[in-house]
From Swiss-Prot:
It is found in: Cell membrane; Early endosome; Golgi apparatus. Beta-adrenergic receptors mediate the catecholamine-induced activation of adenylate cyclase through the action of G proteins. Binds NHERF1 and GPRASP1. Interacts with ARRB1 and ARRB2. Interacts with SRC. Interacts with USP20 and USP33. Interacts with VHL; the interaction, which is increased on hydroxylation of ADRB2, ubiquitinates ADRB2 leading to its degradation. Interacts with EGLN3; the interaction hydroxylates ADRB2 facilitating VHL-E3 ligase-mediated ubiquitination. Interacts (via PDZ-binding motif) with SNX27 (via PDZ domain); the interaction is required when endocytosed to prevent degradation in lysosomes and promote recycling to the plasma membrane. Interacts with CNIH4. Interacts with ARRDC3. PANTHER family: ADRENERGIC RECEPTOR-RELATED G-PROTEIN COUPLED RECEPTOR, BETA-2 ADRENERGIC RECEPTOR. The gene is Adrb2. Belongs to the G-protein coupled receptor 1 family. Adrenergic receptor subfamily. ADRB2 sub-subfamily. It comes from Cavia porcellus. This is Beta-2 adrenergic receptor. SMART domains: 7TM_GPCR_Srsx. Residues 400-418 have a biased composition (Polar residues).
Length: 418
């Protein structure tokens, strides 16, 4: 988001002490600027590297190409654009104590900034709805939200985000009328984001608060449903363990189905936790800024400019967090290690040992325990049971046995964010 006031005030904090030696003061200022330049450069590198890694992993490995991960790709694209087109220019604005790219790019840069934040939270909102259908209607999930439908939803998210960000700024609906704002708009070297009260409140509600409320409400419902499912699993497993062993031997498949169903819901619950961490981190990083953004237009002098800029950069840093959070997923960990050459052909076995045919059934390489050949914990999590011919599920995933209909179609979410 745009900066208020003189951005360099935040950097030149060491000048607060009145040093008599101007050379010493200048050296302190230069050291401070160099230090901030290094920190900001590391932030940019972390954002770009991490999100390129996420996008590449999903594009390269078919296992990761789930509906939910399509939305994760959209989120990573928003973070990547933030790292390439927003954060570097924001850093330059602060470090150089002036804007050197002209008025047109100033408004265009601000529009991209608002676009990325809006697209991110709207994508998170869509992910919350996606998880709601996945956990409440697992049998209908794949027909409700196919990959083609997911692409349409992603396109709609970016179109809506583009309209709510570019249109008001490029049409100058955001502009304030006080003297400082008018002078800044006319000055090529000024790119402080002065806004009128109506725009600040309306844009904050549309771009942040409204999607946030929807996201929190839907995700709270998802967790309530997930909690009830886990409680049912606990009760079912309790009854299962009290059965006579002879009955279990006579009907081993029912026990196997129960274990497989339990694994599915436990993995689904872990996926919910991972996505919950992503949403919670985004909220914690951006909520303080949007609170300050509204407070500032209501009471101009209440929030120091340094605080505004600092909170803005806390929001920027959020774009570097998501790739780290994805490492909770064994699938993403293996993919990242493979891409970084830290794991010798890990995904070669991971992708080729078991493959599904067009009928939804599973073809194997001929080894009865092929999925257990990897000794790492990640592989154990991905392939916990060597399926028999009666199990019409892919080896890396775990789905409830009743998620397969009579034609062999798999209605599980097969979510790789686990």
């Amino acid at each position: 988001m745009g900066h208020l006031g003189n951005g360099s005030d935040f950097l030149l904090a060491p000048n607060a002490s009145h040093a008599p030696d101007h050379n010493v003061t200048r050296e302190r200022d230069e050291a401070w600027v160099v230090g901030m330049a290094i920190v900001m450069s590391l932030i940019v590198l972390a954002i770009v590297f991490g999100n390129v890694l996420v996008i590449t992993a999903i594009a390269k490995f078919e296992r990761l190409q789930t509906v939910t991960n399509y939305f994760i790709t959209s989120l990573a694209c928003a973070d990547l654009v933030m790292g390439l087109a927003v954060v570097p220019f924001g850093a330059s604005h602060i470090l150089m104590n002036m804007w050197t790219f002209g008025n047109f790019w100033c408004e265009f840069w601000t529009s991209i900034d608002v676009l990325c934040v809006t697209a991110s939270i709207e994508t998170l909102c869509v992910i919350a709805v996606d998880r709601y259908f996945a956990i409440t209607s697992p049998f209908k999930y794949q027909s409700l939200l196919t990959k083609n439908k997911a692409r349409v939803v992603i396109l709609m998210v970016w179109v809506v985000s583009g309209l709510t960000s570019f249109l008001p700024i490029q049409m100058h609906w955001y502009r304030a009328t006080h003297k400082d704002a008018i002078n800044c708009y006319a000055e090529e070297t000024c790119c402080d984001f002065f806004t009128n009260q109506a725009y600040a409140i309306a844009s904050s509600i549309v771009s942040f608060y409204l999607p946030l409320v929807v996201m929190v409400f839907v995700y709270s419902r998802v967790f309530q449903v997930a909690k009830k499912q886990l409680q049912k699993i606990d009760r079912s497993e309790g009854r299962f363990h009290t059965q006579n062993l002879s009955q279990v031997e006579q009907d081993g498949r029912s026990g196997h189905g129960l274990r497989r169903s339990s694994k599915f819901y436990l993995k689904e619950h872990k996926a919910l936790k991972t996505l919950g961490i992503i949403m919670g981190t985004f909220t914690l990083c951006w909520l303080p800024f949007f609170i300050v953004n509204i407070v500032h237009v209501i009471q101009d002098n209440l929030i120091p400019k340094e605080v505004y800029i600092l909170l803005n950069w806390v929001g920027y840093v959020n774009s570097a967090f998501n790739p780290l959070i994805y490492c909770r997923s064994p699938d993403f960990r293996i993919a990242f290690q493979e891409l970084l050459c830290l794991r010798r052909s890990a995904l070669k076995a991971y992708g080729n040992d078991c493959s599904s045919n067009s009928n939804g059934k599973t073809d194997y390489t001929g080894e009865p325990n092929v999925c257990h050949q990897g000794q790492e914990k990640e592989r154990e999590l991905l392939c916990e049971d060597p399926p028999g011919t009666e199990d019409l599920v892919s080896c890396p995933g775990t789905v409830p046995s009743d998620s397969i209909d009579s034609q062999g179609r798999n209605y599980s979410t097969n979510d790789s964010l686990l």
